[in-house]
Amino acid sequence: MDNQVLEQKIVNEEYKIWKKNVPYLYDLMFSHTLEWPSLSVQWFPDVRRDEEAGRTTQRLLLSTHTSGSEEEYILIAKVEFPDEFDESLNEEVGGDMRLKIIQRISIMDEANRVRYNPSACNVLAVRSDLPDIHVYDYTKHLSHEKIPRPDMVLRGHSAGGFGLSWNHLNPGELAGCGEGGEVCVFDVSQESSSISPTVVLRRHETAVNDCAFSFFDKKLLSSAGDGGMVVLWDTRSEDCIHAIEEAHTSDILSVRFSPLDGNVIATSSCDGSVKVWDRRSLSQPLHILLGHSKDVVSVEWSPHNDKVLASGSTDRRVIVWDLGQAGAEVPEEYKAEGPPEMKFLHGGHTSTVCDISWNPAEPFEIASVSEDNILQIWQMPQPE
């Protein structure tokens, strides 16, 4: 039996064990097979209640990655949560929840990342393998349009990539990064269909894999990339405030400012670690979180708890971390299960976890997507 067959057998066995234990591990678990993989997932902020039907409806922003097999789309889905779950419907995990794609917007190339503008959620930015960032206003597009018609094209990058970050404090400002090594900042509030960057930031000598604006300082931007370097920028003066040359021992794939603490930054890397930094003292990380066995693709802070963050990996796992537990004593019999700050391990995916998003309306609930077309919405047990 070759290694690939053996690995798949192990994955299948692990999944069977996980599925059997779902009722004991989760407050909520919903799994849905998409037509194509989505490399991107993000909860919209709106929540609609139907008291009569006893249901809550939320929306998710997704995309397609068909590898050239079909047209590519941005997808907007609605998810209906019943107040009470009917156990008899739970042959499929989360059987009485419903997910429906309510809008498809044709795009030029398969999306690496799609993010809505927090100041105007109808405005969506798409980062792909094309150099330009395309912006769509979903109120101006009919579903099933066959020809991609971006409302704005943001020019300035020399190559495609993954990094996209809207500025929560400066409406219409968007940063992007990619394989070309530059970080570009755009103002999409301009009345133009073709927009050049207001700022181009250069310090990285190789690919920049992610960028993120601060939630507390509108001119503070972070970027991270190949070679393990993190850079903090002042976008107004265009200065590099600080560079951590070797924040990780391998390429950094994700960087995020905490939405609840203006001094804290998280990074994740191909070295299998997540690190948490205080920007006032960047010589050493505050925390090094070890629990993944492969590349850590994404890291996202909880919007509800300043000590909690989650990470997704090519090891098929999502781990929720609680920094408040760092350094706590662990009984000998539990040490093999992971460090004290590992709050929860989600083992429902059987392929690389591409992206994760915390539900802003529901504490400890996460949407995660994987390379094998699976979208999962899950809620770990609530703390007492």
UniProtKB/Swiss-Prot annotation:
Outline the WD repeats, range by range. 156-196, 203-243, 247-287, 291-331, 348-384
UniProt key word Nucleus: yes
* Record-linked Pfam families: CAF1C_H4-bd, WD40
Top-rank taxon of the source lineage equals Eukaryota
Membrane-traversing stretches: none
Query: Looking at the keywords, is Repeat present?
Result: yes
**Listed GO biological process terms:** chromatin organization
Where located? Cytoplasm; Nucleus
Query: Any one cellular component term from GO for this entry?
Result: cytoplasm
> Which keywords accompany this UniProt record?
Chromatin regulator, Cytoplasm, Nucleus, Repeat, WD repeat
Q: Which Gene3D superfamilies match?
A: YVTN repeat-like/Quinoprotein amine dehydrogenase
Please describe the quaternary structure of this protein.
Component of the HAT-B complex.
Q: What does this protein do?
A: Regulatory subunit of the histone acetylase B (HAT-B) complex. The complex acetylates histone H4 which is required for telomeric silencing.
List the PANTHER family hit by this protein, alphabetically: WD40 REPEAT FAMILY
Protein family membership: Belongs to the WD repeat RBAP46/RBAP48/MSI1 family.
Q: What is this protein called?
A: Histone acetyltransferase type B subunit 2
Q: Which organism is it from?
A: Encephalitozoon cuniculi (strain GB-M1) (Microsporidian parasite)
Q: What is the lineage of its organism?
A: Eukaryota, Fungi, Fungi incertae sedis, Microsporidia, Unikaryonidae
